[in-house]
Amino acid sequence: MAAADGALPEAAALEQPAELPASVRASIERKRQRALMLRQARLAARPYSATAAAATGGMANVKAAPKIIDTGGGFILEEEEEEEQKIGKVVHQPGPVMEFDYVICEECGKEFMDSYLMNHFDLPTCDNCRDADDKHKLITKTEAKQEYLLKDCDLEKREPPLKFIVKKNPHHSQWGDMKLYLKLQIVKRSLEVWGSQEALEEAKEVRQENREKMKQKKFDKKVKELRRAVRSSVWKRETIVHQHEYGPEENLEDDMYRKTCTMCGHELTYEKM
């Protein structure tokens, strides 16, 4: 009895099919896909056979039965003698092996795939080497134009256009968004425009002198207008008709009298009849 019980698990193990290895399953799948491709190609080569036979009154060329081929992978193929041989000779080249596009950091020389400066400013610098407070500092568009004497065309139209990021104004939220540029790229672009640092400094000095001259000119104009306003007010006061206010009259001699204006000192002499 015990021997019979021990034989049952062994018989059950023999009845269960063994699982095929992964390589065998992959080979079977490739052969199945190839069989489907050959069948589709054969059908596409003669899509109008029934229609052509009906058009010729039922007369059609009768071909021999297709050749049956055992692929050895569990599939049976019906292969035309000439057409399938041509299709079978087609060799598909394997696709290229995709490799990661690594970028070399210009600071440390190490390879990296992604970084903040590379994504936003096309600067090959990894996040570990990023110096946000000094070398890789960001400046506003207004500061770039005032400090480095750049115009809008120098930033946006000169090749290559400089990249920037847009952020809300932290001081005035109701104002428009700020455009922030990489200071390192702004300095490089200013040297391209002005040629050298010395030429840039000379241009800044000339612009500062012109700005001071304009301020002095505006100041002189305001002083001139103020003087003109004062003179015109004095002239207007002088043109007003003066009304004399005479004091008591004085008797000079026979029937002659005199009185003096208390405001301007004008003397009026007259005779009483």
Curated annotation (Swiss-Prot):
unnamed zinc finger span: 105-129
Impact reported for H244R: In XP-A; mild form
Record's keyword annotation contains Calcium: no
Covalent link location (Glycyl lysine isopeptide (Lys-Gly) (interchain with G-Cter in SUMO2)): K63, K86, K145
Originating species: Homo sapiens (Human)
Family annotation (SUPFAM superfamilies): Glucocorticoid receptor-like (DNA-binding domain), Putative DNA-binding domain
Medical condition linked: Xeroderma pigmentosum complementation group A: An autosomal recessive pigmentary skin disorder characterized by solar hypersensitivity of the skin, high predisposition for developing cancers on areas exposed to sunlight and, in some cases, neurological abnormalities. The skin develops marked freckling and other pigmentation abnormalities. XP-A patients show the most severe skin symptoms and progressive neurological disorders.
PTM note: ATR-dependent phosphorylation of XPA at Ser-196 is important for cell survival in response to UV damage. Ubiquitinated by HERC2 leading to degradation by the proteasome.
Keyword annotations from UniProtKB, A to Z: Acetylation, Disease variant, DNA damage, DNA repair, DNA-binding, Isopeptide bond, Metal-binding, Nucleus, Phosphoprotein, Ubl conjugation, Xeroderma pigmentosum, Zinc, Zinc-finger
Entry protein name: DNA repair protein complementing XP-A cells
Location(s) in or outside the cell: Nucleus
Modified residues (N-acetylalanine): A2
Annotated binding of Zn(2+), by residue: C105, C108, C126, C129
One term of GO molecular function: protein domain specific binding
Residue positions, PTM Phosphoserine: S196
InterPro entries hit by this protein: DNA-bd_dom_put_sf, XPA/RAD14, XPA_C, XPA_CS, XPA_sf, Znf_XPA_CS
